[in-house]
Regions:
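Conserved short beta-strand elements that form part of the metal-binding/catalytic scaffold
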Residues: 29-71, 114-141
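Core segments of cupin and vicinal oxygen chelate
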Residues: 2-3, 10-54, 90, 96-115, ...
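Short acidic, gly/pro-rich beta-turn/loop elements at beta-sheet edges
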Residues: 20, 58, 67, 90-92, ...
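Hydrophobic, ordered structural segments
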Residues: 74-84, 97-102, 121, 126-147
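Vicinal oxygen chelate
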Residues: 4-13, 46-49, 68-93, 126
C-alpha cells in the first residue's frame, strides 16, 4: 500500500486554549475551527501547522471521543493519519489482507461509503491497540481540505 504520514490527532478539553498554546509556544499556524458531526460523533477541531508537520487538535463534544477524553484526559494522541493516492486501491488491499475497514464509529465501512463530512474520502483500520486508531485519507482531497481550512 502506498502510504505517507500525514498527521496525528490530539484530544483537547478546550480548542481555543489549545490553539492559543500551540500558536504562542510552538509558533504554529492555526486553521479556522471545523466541525465533524455524524453517527453520534460530534467534535470541533483545528489544524495546527508547525513547519510541515500537522496536528489535528480535537475537542470532542459527544460520542466515543468524548468518552475517551473523559477517561484518559487531555493531550492524548489517539490517532495516526496517513494519506494515499488511491483510497479505493488501499481499501481493496486491506480487504484482500483480511482487514475490514471501518467508519469513525467502528462500524464496517463499505467501499461505496468512503466519503466523510469533511469532504475527504477516509477509511479507518480496526483498533488493535486499545483506543489507538489509524486513519487513511486520499491525498488530493486531504490537501484540498487543509488548504481550505487555512483560507
Amino acid at each position: 500500500m502506498d502510504l505517507k504520514f500525514s498527521h496525528v490527532d490530539v484530544l483537547v478539553n478546550n480548542l481555543e486554549e489549545a490553539c492559543a498554546y500551540y500558536a504562542q509556544v510552538l509558533n504554529a499556524r492555526i486553521s479556522k475551527t471545523l466541525i465533524w458531526e455524524r453517527g453520534g460523533l460530534h467534535v470541533r477541531y483545528a489544524i495546527a501547522l508547525i513547519g510541515q508537520e500537522r496536528f489535528m487538535l480535537v475537542q470532542p463534544l459527544a460520542g466515543n471521543l468524548k468518552e475517551l477524553l473523559d477517561a484518559s484526559g487531555e493531550g492524548m494522541i489517539y490517532r495516526h493519519c496517513y494519506s494515499t493516492p488511491d483510497i479505493e486501491k488501499a481499501y481493496d488491499e486491506l480487504m484482500a489482507a483480511g482487514v475490514q475497514p471501518e467508519d469513525e464509529n467502528g462500524k464496517p465501512l463499505a467501499r461505496a461509503n468512503l466519503q466523510s463530512p469533511s469532504g475527504a474520502r477516509i477509511i479507518w483500520l480496526p483498533k488493535r491497540f486499545g483506543h489507538f486508531s489509524i486513519e487513511i485519507l486520499e491525498d488530493k482531497a486531504l490537501e484540498a481540505f487543509v488548504e481550505a481550512a487555512f483560507s
